[in-house]
Design a protein with these regions (language model features):
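Hydrophobic alpha-helical segments and helix pairs
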Residues: 117-151, 155
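Ferredoxin-like iron-sulfur electron-transfer modules
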Residues: 40-44, 68-91, 102-120, 150
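Flexible beta-alpha connector loops of hexameric P-loop NTPases
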Residues: 157-164
Length: 303
């Protein structure tokens, strides 16, 4: 009977969280975002859930450090930038006037294009009266698909020297949406609350905000909460390394009516496993219990 009951719980959970898009974010780096992302993905896969992990911290992706996998596919990512063709240009300066990002400067004798500032909006190219600014692809990074033991792992990685993460994140999400339609999608977002985080979160069904019970943790959590509310995103909070600080985060969440999904206690053994690049839930029981609480919570709010 016990095995049957457990099976019923597992089937119910599969029905409730299948096809969900979950973003795991934080107001700052180092709170445990990637630790939760990698362990939650692997744990779901061990329960026969169809799941894919996508590392969207494209400037410094590190989920691969904790996942044993083999490369299955790779794809070059480009963004479109204008290239000045001088032959027909009348140097009217209209291109520089319409660019909101100062990516184009009109000089008396030439047009300068700064690709690192270009947002690929096509305004300069479309409004040029002599068609002297055709758009051309410029490589910005690569998407790599890996196969782990029982789940797929996608990594977006921005090339060195590239300054705009949003196009890379957008194309990585598109790759996942196209190739992994019928499964749970877990997005490991960049840290912070700027444009890359918004791009990683805005189409998700639910966001998990990772924080810690310290003054810095609370400050950055408030910024992350404000961001999610602007996006009108459903979200909950996980307090990681619970026990190292005070109760200010809990008081804040209570006052703001923010659900605390689970509290993961501070544990030296967790830190040791992390430093070795190992998954934690197979060896730390209380950590696995926290993952169960996450799965149960998401199933409840989606049910």
């Amino acid at each position: 009977m016990q095995a049957t009951a457990e099976g019923m719980v597992q089937i119910e959970t599969k029905m409730q969280i299948d096809n969900l898009k979950i973003t795991i974010a934080s107001g700052k780096g180092g709170t445990g975002k990637t630790t939760i992302s990698t362990n939650l993905t692997s744990y779901l896969a061990s329960k026969a859930q169809e799941v894919v992990l996508c590392d969207l911290d494209v400037e410094e992706p590190n989920s691969a450090l904790f996942i044993k996998s083999s490369l299955k596919n790779e794809q070059i990512c480009n963004k479109m930038v204008p290239k000045w063709e001088s032959e027909e240009c009348i140097l009217c300066g209209e291109c520089a006037k319409v660019c909101n990002f100062n990516a184009i400067v009109a000089l008396p004798s030439e047009i300068l294009v700064f690709p690192e500032l270009c947002h690929s909006c096509y305004a300069c190219s479309e409004l040029c009266p002599t068609n002297s600014l055709p758009m051309n692809p410029q490589k910005i990074g690569e998407i790599k698909e890996y196969q782990a033991q029982n789940f797929s792992f996608i990594e977006g990685r921005l090339d060195l020297g590239q300054e705009m993460a949003v196009p890379m994140i957008s194309q990585t999400i598109e790759y996942v949406e196209k190739n992994f339609k019928d499964c749970i999608k877990i997005f490991d977002a960049p840290p912070g609350t700027s444009c890359p985080v918004i791009e990683a979160s805005r189409e998700s069904d639910f966001a998990i905000l990772i924080t810690e019970a310290t003054p810095f943790g609370l400050n950055d959590l408030k910024l992350a909460v404000e961001t999610m509310r602007v996006l009108k995103q459903k979200f909950g909070v996980i307090i990681n390394r619970y026990g190292i600080g005070d109760d200010s985060v809990e008081i804040y969440c209570k006052n703001e009516d923010i659900p605390i999904i689970t509290k993961i206690k501070n544990d030296k053994e967790v830190a040791k496993l992390y430093s070795k690049g190992e998954l934690i839930y197979p060896k730390i029981e209380h950590f696995k219990s926290s993952l169960d609480e996450i799965i149960s919570f998401i199933g409840d709010i989606n049910g």
